[in-house]
Amino acid sequence: MAKVIGIDLGTTNSCVAIMDGAQPRVIENSEGARTTPSIVGFTDSERLVGQPAKRQAVTNPSNTVFAVKRLIGRRVGDAEVEKDKKLVPYSIVNGGNGDAWVEVRGEKYSPSQISAFILQKMKETAEAYLGETVTQAVITVPAYFNDAQRQATKDAGKIAGLEVLRIINEPTAAALAYGLDKKDTKTIAVYDLGGGTFDITILEIDDGLFEVKSTNGDTFLGGEDFDMRIVNYLADEFKKEHGVDLTLDKMALQRLKEAAEKAKIELSSSQQTEINQPFISMDRNTGQPLHMVMKLTRAKLESLVGDLIKKSLKPCEAALKDAGVSKSDIDEVVLVGGMTRMPRVVEEVTKFFGKEPHKGVNPDEVVALGAAIQAGVLQGDVKDVVLLDVTPLSLGIETLGGVFTRLIDRNTTIPTKKSQVFSTAEDNQNAVTIRVFQGEREMAADNKLLGQFNLEDIPPAPRGMPQIEVTFDIDANGIVSVSAKDKGTGKSQNITIQASGGLSDEDIEKMVRDAEANAEADKKRRELVETKNQGESLLHSTRKSIEEHGDKVDPSTVEAIELAMGALEEALKSEDAGKIKGGIQNLTEAAMRLGEAIYKASQAEGGATPDEEGPRSVDDDIVDADFEDLGENKRK
């Protein structure tokens, strides 16, 4: 039975894990790292994912996409998208359906597509380790992701060639990994501050039962924001000193971003770090190069980002209130996400909850490990684990006057189903439009519109008379289906909610085909590179053999080999793998004649020597030796 893999699709880094016997384990990627940068780079000739993409980001900033998770399921015009446009060097554009997409080298990509490229890398990592094809996965999302963002993540899995068996919340996955072997009853808080999102989840764990009591968060708060605070500080200081605005130069901005991330990491273990960026700009008056050499202290960093850390504590208050527990009721605080390595974050969390956080989990890997456990549960490999998650935001419809009428409150355990009867607002109304929203505001317009549909052919009747039953159904992935039924006629209409724009089935199928075509193209490119390497290696070894042994063979053999070498050199200039293979075959055959000639020549040389020295008897090779028989006594 093929393995189901667990994937933590992160804003900054991603990670893949599997169940290895009774325990989950993280799989190293082709570079030997346990996490992979969630970065996709586009060059003239290829698409790079992970570390190779990160390495070329400074020289190719406009065509390198990072932190795309912050755009997934979002619309152009959203405040978060407008903010992101100012922070990233690549283009964020309208996808044509109102969704925020990215444009690279004149081609538009949906965030789901970019995420799919990262998921493909995770899939390939698992396949290389397992030695078999992987088709199913559990993928994690921030607990505070709305329906559109969850649906877009599921679409990304489909584009990557994966059947997504479950979308699981990141803090819940972390709790699974933390509590898998724990038998006692505990109430825990999972504080998850990652690269782009923040979640706080309160859970009760009781001998294999994981029950989420509440969740809260901010899907636009994370390490990327901390990095940008440092970038802005460095750019401001440089402008004060040299009068040059580095934020206008995409390449300089990318260098600053990498320097900021490195400095932030270093300041988690040291009090001061130096940021050294030579030749980062040029003096417009003198034409002389300008260098950035600055010191950054931990205290300065903490002053730059203090409000961001404080911002994470408000959702913690809300989550405790919704769960009906106090800070003193929390038995353990589990820290998740790379940003929780920052000492000031740990201090603030300790102060807030009144206890030292648990440090027994790797914050970068624990979510992927939890996803692997959930995969094991679904596959039947992990027994006695029951997971009860919740929907993070209230769901409802718009009613008369633009009011948001809730059908399912936030923190309701999922899967769940809820129905409510509504009626018409006008006499003889023959159709109703059901507009579905998600959020906590009282007016529908202030919440997130998930989608809408019409129920038509309602028989004419006075207002308030028709009975229209609206049913919300949320599955275990947190994805919403809505139906409306006229109880008088039995006529019904239903939809699985997609983002207001969203990807249609046709869009997804096209992207799946593109991904498959790209996979085939990548395979051909790899085959071409390997064939070229083989050809160059053969040329080198043959050339060396001619230099050393060319005088031992007749000139016609050498000439034939040199002709074959010339033909292969020409073939190597092309991009035709078949032509190169033909050249390799011809040179291999010609080089074999060289080997045969060398072997015959050495045999001839070796065979002439004994005749010149004259015949020898068999005894010539025997050496006489005297020995003394010790006898029995002498042997003892």
From Swiss-Prot:
Keyword Nucleotide-binding set for record: yes
Keyword ATP-binding in record: yes
Induction: By stress conditions e.g. heat shock.
Residue ranges, annotated region (Disordered): 602-636
Composition bias, Acidic residues: 620-630
One function term, GO molecular function aspect: unfolded protein binding
Residues recorded as bearing Phosphothreonine in the entry: 197
Entry keyword set: ATP-binding, Chaperone, Nucleotide-binding, Phosphoprotein, Stress response
InterPro entries for this protein: ATPase_NBD, Chaperone_DnaK, Heat_shock_70_CS, HSP70_C_sf, HSP70_peptide-bd_sf, Hsp_70_fam
Alphabetized Pfam families for the sequence: HSP70
Record's function text: Acts as a chaperone.
Family from the record: Belongs to the heat shock protein 70 family.
Name of the molecule in the record: Chaperone protein DnaK
Protein species of origin: Cereibacter sphaeroides (strain ATCC 17029 / ATH 2.4.9) (Rhodobacter sphaeroides)
